[in-house]
């Protein structure tokens, strides 16, 4: 008899998933039975939740490792089937999570209130006992009621805004709805019940004490807004004249409606204040300067105190955080601000050769007479990094539109940035908006901006050297059209352990921190950990919901190490354009070290490629055009020609002149602007049309002479390379 054929891996996994689904459905049905109210039964159900959750995690790990190569026969729609199984496991996880939360709350309720059996036994004992025992029992009951009142308030609160449930166990409510608060927790998430009897967690910042008297007071105060006064106070206690201008009532009305206002006394003074629901007091620093404001008094709404100097400014991020549009751990992007401050953190700065302290020779560009090219220079850090994905990244609110999701990385020692700041743009799917991926599959060449494979070089001797990753989004506010960039979290991967040994080359799962790299102990989304209960199961679920970044450090082979050693000592870039950077370095070495009449000469050098190539590092789409043109040209070369280094360099210069120079000085090409989709689309259309014409006409000469092509007026800087001038510019 023939042996039974073993199931294929995906088929076997699908069978196990169906068995798990049946067990979860059975457990959910069992929890609905009347017997499930017993404590022992609840404990049994809770243990089953943990066991099933572990089994689901094992299946998820096995599913992630599966590939088409594991199948003995071709499977139709393999990726789609894997995605369906992943969705099923996620659904089962959510069901178990909801059941575990329900059981945990029932256990909490049981601790706070006596069971029916205890009440019956107490009533029987009270009937048998005498009058003195009845009095003692009444005192004990009153004591228990007072103790239970510590966590069960039974107070009514009114919702000051709309809140939509974000996770299982939250309570959705609308503005103006009356809620009965059952339990006040110190973490700011209270258990409340609405008029329909629905119970769940609500944020306390959305609630205000409700009473009919306060409602009457508020309505009367809103009717007399014209009598509201604003006073300026200084550190000396001097009081500025009250506001009496006729526009004050309109301003005060805007305050009550929006919570954000701008008070304009004169053209030169504009105070921007975010009115928070929790009351704040005026703050004075140790130097005695005025550094705060007294927030809006919710009950009286009678006075608003403002400091006069220095002008208190609260940025857009504070406004968005107060409005609930972004999580509390989001901040203005630190690395983006460094890029805007100057040129010293850009790749073109680190690409330029560096002089020795004597100013008589180059420090990182030397000539190898034996090889006839620039000399290889090893560095302390030389590695290749792959960005895999970002998971569970919180979503911003509907009031802002996300223009770009990206990761910025640089070398960091805990205090300062030690390299250029490299940016990799992420892609995402509407089905999984919290997951970012890199290096997507494309029909043509992969744009260098999306390339998740990065090289990293550094010769820094710092023992705390590591890689700083900052996840960010570029956004535009729907209401004002204001643009900005937010940090969605950061993480620091130290490259050496305490004994100075490099960390191993492997995949790292890094949990993100909130705030800025100079702030410690801040979470990206504090609401995730605030909801963590004491159970191990819920803590595991909470850890899985934390934002994280997956990266892989790859070990270098001999060829990769030789290639990287031709680059500057300190530089971060993408692997897809590394061969173009090496061409630039080799041609730079030829011009500065081999072909110069005198090494002490500082004359200007006529070389368009050296003068303009650093500009490509700030215009990735033009760099992609050069990559595409060079790949097309290289495919036509013979093997003997590819082995000839001098022939390759001269051919590369011809391709550069035909492709890059006309594009850089064309008036049809809009200026490069980060995260502007319309501009990026228009630029890529111009570039694509130009490359197509070059391919058809076998060069750019016809396009340059065409009356349709309009170019910028000629400038001598297009042809002139001044290496000392570039260094002076970078130093400034």
Curated annotation (Swiss-Prot):
The keyword Phosphoprotein applies. Phosphorylation by CK2 is required for the interaction with PACS1 and the targeting to the base region of cilia. Residues 103-153, 205-244 are annotated as: Disordered. Residues 115-145, 210-236 have a biased composition (Acidic residues). Keywords: Cell junction, Cell projection, Ciliopathy, Cilium, Cilium biogenesis/degradation, Coiled coil, Cytoplasm, Cytoskeleton, Differentiation, Disease variant, Joubert syndrome, Leber congenital amaurosis, Nephronophthisis, Phosphoprotein, Senior-Loken syndrome, SH3 domain, Spermatogenesis, Tight junction. One of its GO terms (cellular component) is cytoskeleton. InterPro entries: NPHP1, NPHP1_SH3, SH3-like_dom_sf, SH3_domain. Transmembrane segments: none annotated. Together with BCAR1 it may play a role in the control of epithelial cell polarity. Involved in the organization of apical junctions in kidney cells together with NPHP4 and RPGRIP1L/NPHP8. Does not seem to be strictly required for ciliogenesis. Seems to help to recruit PTK2B/PYK2 to cell matrix adhesions, thereby initiating phosphorylation of PTK2B/PYK2 and PTK2B/PYK2-dependent signaling. May play a role in the regulation of intraflagellar transport (IFT) during cilia assembly. Required for normal retina development. The SH3 domain mediates the stable interaction with Cas. Nephronophthisis type 1 patients deficient for NPHP1 show normal overall integrity of respiratory cilia. This is Nephrocystin-1. It comes from Homo sapiens.
């Amino acid at each position: 008899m023939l042996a039974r054929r073993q199931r294929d891996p995906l088929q076997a996994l699908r069978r196990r998933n169906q068995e798990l689904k049946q067990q979860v459905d059975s457990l959910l049905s069992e929890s609905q039975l009347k017997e499930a109210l017993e404590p022992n039964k609840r404990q049994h159900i809770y243990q089953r939740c943990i066991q099933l959750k572990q089994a689901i995690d094992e299946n998820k790990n096995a599913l992630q490792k599966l590939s088409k190569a594991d199948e003995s026969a071709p499977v139709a729609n393999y990726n789609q089937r894997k995605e369906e199984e992943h969705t099923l496991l996620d659904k089962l996880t959510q069901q178990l999570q909801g059941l575990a939360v329900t059981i945990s709350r029932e256990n909490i309720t049981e601790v706070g209130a006596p069971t029916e059996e205890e009440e019956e036994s107490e009533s029987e004992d009270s009937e048998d006992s005498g009058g003195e025992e009845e009095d003692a029992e009444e005192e004990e009951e009153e004591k228990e009621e007072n103790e239970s009142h510590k966590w069960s308030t039974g107070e009514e609160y009114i919702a000051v805004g709309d809140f939509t449930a974000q996770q299982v166990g939250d309570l959705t409510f609308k503005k103006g709805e009356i809620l009965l608060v059952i339990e006040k927790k110190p973490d700011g998430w209270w258990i409340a019940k609405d008029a329909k009897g629905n119970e769940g967690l609500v944020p306390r910042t959305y609630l205000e004490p409700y009473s009919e008297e306060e409602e009457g007071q508020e309505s009367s105060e809103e009717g007399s807004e014209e009598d509201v006064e604003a006073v300026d106070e200084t550190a000396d206690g001097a009081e500025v004249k009250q506001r009496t201008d006729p526009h004050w009532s309109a301003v005060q009305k805007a305050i009550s409606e929006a919570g954000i206002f701008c008070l304009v006394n004169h053209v030169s003074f504009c105070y921007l204040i975010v009115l928070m629901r929790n009351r704040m007091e005026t703050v004075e620093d140790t130097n005695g300067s005025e550094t705060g404001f007294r927030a809006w008094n919710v009950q009286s709404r009678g006075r608003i105190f403002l400091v006069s100097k220095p002008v208190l400014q609260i940025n857009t991020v504070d406004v968005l955080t107060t409005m609930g549009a972004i999580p509390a751990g989001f901040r203005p992007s630190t690395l983006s601000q460094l890029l805007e401050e100057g040129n010293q953190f850009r790749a073109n700065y680190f690409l330029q050769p560096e002089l020795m302290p004597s100013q008589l020779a180059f420090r990182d560009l030397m000539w190898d007479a034996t090889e006839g090219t620039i000399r290889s220079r090893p560095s302390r850090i030389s590695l290749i990094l792959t960005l895999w994905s970002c998971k569970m990244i919180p979503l911003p609110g509907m009031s802002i539109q996300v223009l770009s999701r990206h990761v910025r990385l640089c070398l960091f020692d805990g205090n300062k940035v030690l390299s250029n700041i490299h940016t990799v743009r992420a892609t995402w799917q509407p089905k999984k908006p919290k997951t970012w991926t890199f290096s997507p599959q494309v029909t043509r060449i992969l744009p260098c901006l999306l390339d998740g494979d990065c090289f990293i070089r550094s010769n820094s001797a710092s023992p705390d050297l590591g890689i700083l990753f900052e996840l960010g989004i570029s956004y535009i506010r729907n209401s004002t059209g204001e643009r900005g960039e937010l940090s969605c979290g950061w993480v620091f991967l130290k490259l050496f352990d305490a004994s100075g040994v490099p960390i191993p080359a492997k995949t790292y799962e890094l949990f993100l921190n909130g705030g800025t790299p100079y702030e410690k102990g801040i979470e990206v989304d504090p609401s995730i950990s605030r909801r963590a209960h004491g159970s191990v199961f819920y803590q595991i679920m909470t850890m899985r919901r934390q934002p994280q970044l997956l990266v892989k450090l790859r070990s270098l082979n001999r060829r990769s190490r030789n290639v990287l050693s031709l680059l500057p000592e300190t530089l971060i870039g993408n692997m897809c354009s590394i061969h173009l950077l090496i061409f630039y370095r080799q041609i730079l070495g030829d011009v500065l070290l081999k072909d110069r009449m005198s090494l002490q000469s500082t004359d200007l050098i006529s070389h368009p490629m050296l003068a303009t190539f650093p500009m490509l590092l700030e215009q990735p789409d033009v760099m992609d055009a050069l990559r595409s043109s060079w790949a097309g040209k290289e495919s036509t070369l013979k093997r003997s020609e590819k082995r000839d280094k001098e022939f390759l360099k001269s051919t590369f210069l011809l391709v550069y002149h035909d492709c890059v120079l006309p594009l850089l000085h064309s008036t049809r090409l809009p200026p490069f602007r980060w995260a502007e989709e319309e501009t990026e689309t228009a630029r890529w259309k111009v570039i694509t049309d130009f490359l197509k014409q070059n391919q058809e006409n076998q060069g750019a000469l016809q396009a340059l002479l065409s009356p349709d092509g309009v170019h910028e007026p000629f400038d001598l800087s297009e042809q002139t390379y001044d290496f000392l001038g570039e260094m002076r510019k970078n130093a400034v």
